[in-house]
Amino acid sequence: MTNENNNDSEFAELKIRGKIFKLPILKASIGEDVIDISRVSAEADCFTYDPGFMSTASCQSTITYIDGDKGILRHRGYDIKDLAEKSDFLEVAYLLIYGELPSGEQYNNFTKQVAHHSLVNERLHYLFQTFCSSSHPMAIMLAAVGSLSAFYPDLLNFKEADYELTAIRMIAKIPTIAAMSYKYSIGQPFIYPDNSLDFTENFLHMMFATPCTKYTVNPIIKNALNKIFILHADHEQNASTSTVRIAGSSGANPFACISTGIASLWGPAHGGANEAVINMLKEIGSSEYIPKYIAKAKDKNDPFRLMGFGHRVYKNYDPRAAVLKETCKEVLKELGQLDNNPLLQIAIELEAIALKDEYFIERKLYPNVDFYSGIIYKAMGIPSQMFTVLFAIARTVGWMAQWKEMHEDPEQKISRPRQLYTGYVHREYKGIRER
């Protein structure tokens, strides 16, 4: 991938053991420029050290831009707030995958294709039956998505012509598998997709309908879930997206790649944070105890952590959190819980107190996307073990867009991070009787 804004006349100088190396500065279209260190190891006989890759750009991308200091998130140049308020999830999916918003005809064709591919092979039901009833839905979904490669053996050796159809299949089937995982975990029959419903309605239908009870989708709930899906669709090179790219760099089939993303997302520091927020609000219990827990959060010797505040990238108010705060109020008002939902009251007061506290101001700890999403899910009747599953439904769009972009990038190679070795230099082996 070539950045047209790169200027080969700009260099950074790096001095190593008395020798100066000139490193090209690659110009970003917006945001931070990047120093190209790709030749340092070959020319200077050393590597760079960056735990957590916080100062490392692993790729060039045109999909998502974040300015953490200003609280900006854009997909293909469009502000996330505009997309959340004016677009719908499948339109954003099209934007991420193809790079442009669709025309009316393109949108209709895309949504029809997604609906057409929402069914999964009937034999997948046997896989679900191998899990015990107490299995976490994420465990079931992780296995089910990985198993899709068995049903599409032609994609074990995929070609460029397969990229778009693969993305559509994945976007279509993930909600079906997610709903099946939930239904199995609670012992209810699976509900098949209904192609007369749109993407979000269909998922709610598969989640909450039963063979003997039709589920009527509340438009406020549908709109809220649509926003949540959009807000979680992509977020640049985070842990799960990087995992998908690393797996994809080896040439692994797309179903295997997405399953690695799901595994990474399952980690409590990544996709499980909104569930942790709910547990924290329950632990606080009442607004009167907020000062006590604020003090605990400041005490470095106290294990308590204020969940839903702070972000590895954002040093300002997370723009997704601002949308979700208002969405949360809309949902609770519709459900008659706006004035009597204890979790919301604690959350609002906790946010207000924290944003005025110098400790949090100095450390730039603002509410993030996880702070209000769990409250919305809980009000919708979605159990906490499904929170990360819904995150995976939304993020699959970003994963597939990033996977497609990676394979279209001629500069990409198989990922191979290096290390700073600090172990033993050399030891002689001794037999077990001599140790």
UniProtKB/Swiss-Prot annotation:
Xref: Pfam families: Citrate_synt (PF00285)
Organism: Rickettsia slovaca (strain 13-B)
Top-level class of the enzyme under EC nomenclature: transferase
GO BP: tricarboxylic acid cycle
Protein name per UniProt: Citrate synthase
Family under the similarity heading: Belongs to the citrate synthase family.
Reaction catalysis annotation: oxaloacetate + acetyl-CoA + H2O = citrate + CoA + H(+)
Protein keywords: Transferase, Tricarboxylic acid cycle
Record GO cellular component, one term: cytoplasm
Pathway: Carbohydrate metabolism; tricarboxylic acid cycle; isocitrate from oxaloacetate: step 1/2
Gene3D superfamilies to which the protein is assigned, alphabetical: 2.20.28.60, Citrate Synthase, domain 1, Cytochrome P450-Terp, domain 2
EC number: 2.3.3.16
Molecular function as annotated in GO: citrate (Si)-synthase activity
Record-linked PROSITE patterns: CITRATE_SYNTHASE (PS00480)
Additional record remark: Citrate synthase is found in nearly all cells capable of oxidative metabolism.
List of catalytic residues: 311, 370
